[in-house]
Regions:
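Accessory alpha-helical/coil subdomains and C-terminal extensions
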Residues: 1-52, 59-66
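Short alpha-helical segments enriched in small residues
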Residues: 64-243
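Short acidic (Asp/Glu) and glycine-rich catalytic loops that position anionic groups and cofactors
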Residues: 10-13, 52-54, 74-75, 145-147
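A generic structural signal for well-ordered coil/turn residues at beta-strand boundaries
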Residues: 13-15, 41, 52-54, 129-130, ...
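Beta-strand residues in well-ordered beta-sheet regions across diverse protein folds
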Residues: 57-59, 203
């Protein structure tokens, strides 16, 4: 009956661990770990997706079982795992930047300062975050940041070339080790066939090189800003962690 089962559950001491991931959809995550993981691990696995990623929660009566399964899952998921426990991705960025003494600066367009806001929510960020600029209009990209007017005229504000210049310019402006830029079409209007709503470019510049990644998010403005900020922070995490 249900009553003895409930009594057992009430008196049971459960251990748990959370594995935080980002940049991988829930369906893909389950596909990656379900086949290699055997079913006799005596643990319960729960998946909790959000706009920022997927949290995996492992629960068991035996702590050693959790540790074993955690090691297997983190090995399978690799770089998509950003934390064990409750730390946010911005907490990890600040922690790793402090550990490795890497200073940061950010030039934001479509996210409107959200990335800088998330970083400065973390205590100690003032030691590594040199500053940021919100260059929302084309004129501010040119006049404030120093992006070439020819670059914007030829390729557009939302382009790999503009994101590259933005990242390089902001790094030099603040004399930081790492400069990050983001430019995109948040929506719901402003898109085209060639450049649809949700198209976003993120640039990352160091003294050695500048790289740009292209992302295609959805059609909802608020979601696009959150997802874009998470993608930017994740790339920053990988860079400051020397992964």
């Amino acid at each position: 009956t249900i009553i003895p089962w409930l009594k057992d559950r009430v008196n049971m001491v459960l251990f748990s661990q959370t594995i935080r991931t980002t940049g991988i959809p829930e369906s893909k995550l389950i596909e990656v770990i379900s086949s290699p993981i055997k079913s006799d691990h005596d643990c319960e696995i729960g998946y909790y997706p959000s706009i920022f990623g997927v949290d995996i929660r492992i629960s068991s009566k035996r702590k050693e079982n959790i540790q074993s399964l955690q090691n297997q899952i983190t090995a399978l998921l690799g770089k998509t795992v950003f934390a064990l426990g409750d730390d946010s991705i911005e907490e990890i960025v600040v922690k790793k930047a402090l550990e490795n003494e890497i200073s940061l600066s950010i030039a934001e367009s479509c996210t409107g300062g959200l990335i800088g806001h998330r970083i400065t929510q973390i205590s100690g960020s003032s030691k590594i975050f040199k500053g940021g600029v919100v260059v929302y209009s084309n004129s501010s990209k040119v006049n404030l940041l120093g992006v070439g007017e020819n670059c914007i005229n030829e390729y557009g504000a939302v382009s790999e070339e503009t994101a590259k210049e933005m990242a390089e310019r902001v790094r030099v402006m603040f004399s930081s080790e790492l400069g990050l830029s983001i430019t995109g079409i948040a929506g719901p209007s402003g898109g085209s066939k060639e450049k649809p709503v949700g198209l976003t470019y993120i640039g990352l510049s160091t003294k050695q090189q500048t790289k740009v990644q292209k992302f295609q998010f959805g059609s909802i403005r608020s979601s696009n800003k959150l997802r874009a900020s998470q993608a930017a922070l994740n790339w920053m995490r990988l860079e400051v962690s020397n992964v």
